Amino acid sequence: MEKAEAAAVVIPLSVSNPSYRGSGMSDQEVSEEQSAGDAWVSAAMAAAEAVAAAATSTGIDNTNDYTYTAASENGDPGFTLGDNTYGPNGAASGCPSPPSPEVVGLEMVVVSSLAPEIAAAVPADTIFASAAAPATRVDDGNAPLLGPGQAQDYDSESGCYYSESDNETASMFIRRVGRRQARRHRRRRVALTVAGVILVVVLCAISGIVGAFLARVFP
């Protein structure tokens, strides 16, 4: 199908800018220049109407019947207009085919390229086992629920674990830490008491042995 093309029409500067005045031009010359510009505008409009009439008479439904890919200023891929994208009345006669993942963006490409590395780093059976493993409690039940991977990171001696869940408030945490410190102090007191008793018993035994030895040496 042949395309109807309009001849290039050159519009002088005075038409695009009516207030333009060349150097040394009188008022009469300016009015003559504007009259000539009006003639050029009329000729251009007549040529455009002739092109539109020719396109209608030859049955051209879409003057953009060639494939054109528009790209944005930042280099992103644009859209494609193909044959019969628009009907004779200017409305869309059909939807273009969906763009490929490369056109949409790099998200799908990046995810697909990293999938083997993710599978190699974290095996699927490990993920399923971690998800199916029940939650465990550490300490004596006062600590919040911990998963299998979190139990080894919990420091029961320092007692400075903050729960990541929303079921433990600040007051609950303070009470839990206070109970742990009280138990630690109580165990320390018991240990010191036992150590003192043992030390007294050992000293008594040593003194008895020394007394018996001295009694035998010095009758």
Curated annotation (Swiss-Prot):
Cell location: Virion membrane; Host Golgi apparatus membrane; Host smooth endoplasmic reticulum membrane; Host cell membrane
UniProt modification remark: Phosphorylated on serines within the acidic cluster. Phosphorylation determines whether endocytosed viral US9 traffics to the trans-Golgi network or recycles to the cell membrane.
Protein topology in the membrane: Single-pass type II membrane protein
PTM annotation (Phosphoserine): residues: S163, S165
GO-annotated biological processes: intracellular transport of virus
Main location: virion
Motif mapping: Di-leucine internalization motif: 145-146
Pfam families noted in UniProt: Herpes_US9 (PF06072)
Residue segments, region Acidic: 153-168
Intravirion side: 1-193
UniProt KW keywords: Host cell membrane, Host endoplasmic reticulum, Host Golgi apparatus, Host membrane, Membrane, Phosphoprotein, Signal-anchor, Transmembrane, Transmembrane helix, Viral envelope protein, Virion
Annotated TM spans: 194-214
One Gene Ontology term, aspect cellular component: host cell
Virion surface side: 215-219
Assigned protein family: Belongs to the alphaherpesvirinae envelope protein US9 family.
Main function: Essential for the anterograde spread of the infection throughout the host nervous system. Together with the gE/gI heterodimer, US9 is involved in the sorting and transport of viral structural components toward axon tips.
The protein's name in its UniProt record: Envelope protein US9 homolog
Source organism per UniProt: Equine herpesvirus 1 (strain Ab4p) (EHV-1)
